[in-house]
């Protein structure tokens, strides 16, 4: 993988439209992206890290309690935020991006789940992704977390990673060493011939795997899976511990 990105990644799609059902009752009145971890709403963690990586414009989709998110990001300038409104129909992780493509332009962009959290170790993982991006060999680059050692995650893992970063699915294996950490860089061309309406990003993962063009880099730091109210305290503790180490 290259060490310098020939084309900086300047735009991002941030997914903030989900219902947050597993986070209830908190999300009955507060959208999940605005739940605070480490003293800051999860959405702000995502946007701040995008800004640190050089992203200038972010498209944020909204559905559940949309007005709260719109008001929260209204004054942001780094990155500048444009809203993609999904109040009428929640379009999932793939369909929401397809709707927003006219706002994202023709260049590769970051795709970020607004609840993607990790404690950094002094380096910017998103900057590392931008540096690793190689449009000649990749259609999509994923940020991966080590399944073992992640906070709040008890799943079987998603991907196996070769030495050159090439990714394959877990398949029939009992476990895989890496989990998708909720951040990707992707080409807009991937969305050609995709369904109208809701669909999952998994469709594009599988397309990129089939063409041998899905790669991943491993997150430096500790990934925090904040899916339920019970996961908030461990995530807060992980942020506090990281802050002490790097103070």
Predicted regions and their residues:
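Conserved N-terminal catalytic core of the sugar/cofactor nucleotidyltransferase
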Residues: 1-14, 22, 36, 40-113, ...
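Short beta-strand-to-loop element that shapes/binds the nucleotide-sugar donor at the catalytic cleft/hinge
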Residues: 64, 140-158
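Catalytic-core segments of class I nucleotidyltransferases/pyrophosphorylases
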Residues: 108-110, 117, 121-135, 147-151, ...
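Cofactor-binding loop segments of dinucleotide-utilizing enzymes, especially the Rossmann-like FAD-
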Residues: 17, 63, 114, 145-146, ...
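A generic structural signal for alpha->beta connector loops
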Residues: 31, 55, 78-80, 137, ...
């Amino acid at each position: 993988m290259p060490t310098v990105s020939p084309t900086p990644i300047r735009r991002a799609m941030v997914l903030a439209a989900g219902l947050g059902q597993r986070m209830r009752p908190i999300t009955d009145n507060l959208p999940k992206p605005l739940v605070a971890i480490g003293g800051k709403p999860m959405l702000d963690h995502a946007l701040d890290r995008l800004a640190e990586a050089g992203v200038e414009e972010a498209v944020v989709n909204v559905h559940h309690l949309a007005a709260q998110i719109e008001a929260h990001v209204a004054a942001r300038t780094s990155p500048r935020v444009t809203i993609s409104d999904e109040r009428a129909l929640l379009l999932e992780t793939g369909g929401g991006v397809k709707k927003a493509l006219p706002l994202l332009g023709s260049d590769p962009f970051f795709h970020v789940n607004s609840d993607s959290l990790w404690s950094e170790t002094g380096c910017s993982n998103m900057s590392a992704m931008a540096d690793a991006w190689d449009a000649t060999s990749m259609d999509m680059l994923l940020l991966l977390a080590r399944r073992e050692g992640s906070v709040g995650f008890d799943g079987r893992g998603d991907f196996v990673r070769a030495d050159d970063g090439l990714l394959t699915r877990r398949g029939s294996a009992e476990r895989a060493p890496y989990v998708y950490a909720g951040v990707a860089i992707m080409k807009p061309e991937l969305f050609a011939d995709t369904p109208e309406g809701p669909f999952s990003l998994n469709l594009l993962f599988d397309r990129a795997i089939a063409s041998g063009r899905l790669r991943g880099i491993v997150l430096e730091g500790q990934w925090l899976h904040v899916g339920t109210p019970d996961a908030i305290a461990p995530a807060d503790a992980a942020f506090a511990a990281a802050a002490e180490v790097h103070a």
